[in-house]
Amino acid sequence: FYNGYKPSFYSNNEMVELCGWNFIMLNSAVRDMSRGFFSPEKLSNLIHQCKGSVALVLHHPPIEQEGWLNRKLLENRDKFNDIIQHEENIRLVLYGHTHFHTKEAINGIVYSSAPSIGFAFNPNLHKFEIADGEEGFSIIEIDGDNIVITKQFL
């Protein structure tokens, strides 16, 4: 990082409670790799510390993507999904690295990625391509267990 600055999320997993929800920031970055990896033991320990609904936040996609973006996945995503599918309080998984908006529910858990404010990728191609006009961000509204995710274009 710049001049040796190393933000805490680079090497740590962190948790914060916000409005009755527990947000776990799971570090999936691995030096010199474009794919991600996480510690199953650390994830399980963090989940078991939570009371109430849980949102997991990580950089690498924990589910298959379209086209060329499958090169950027969470390497041990099967283990990740196995862990969270057996936990009743996991409601939301937010991830990045895709630079486009996705949202789908799998076994009652909402998975979503946000578009990028800098540039967006076209996910439906076999090779890298910028998707002009798709830049934006997501607005996430949570009311109890009701989750609404809206994509906003810039």
Where do the protein language model's features map onto the residues?
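Short beta-strand segments
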Residues: 57-59, 94-96, 112-113, 151
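Active-site environment of divalent metal-dependent phosphoester hydrolases
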Residues: 1, 31-34, 62-66, 90-106, ...
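A short C-terminal boundary segment appended to hydrolase-like catalytic domains
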Residues: 138-154
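Extended active-site neighborhood of metal-dependent phosphoesterases/phosphodiesterases
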Residues: 1-45, 76-89, 115, 119, ...
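Conserved beta-strand termini and adjacent loop/short-helix elements that scaffold enzyme active sites
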Residues: 26, 114, 150-154
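Short, conserved, surface-exposed binding loops centered on an aromatic residue
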Residues: 48, 84, 103
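Beta-strand-turn-beta hairpins that frame and shape the catalytic cleft
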Residues: 15-25, 50-55, 105-111, 142-147
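Active-site-proximal segments of metal-dependent phosphoesterases and phosphodiesterases across multiple
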Residues: 52-91, 98
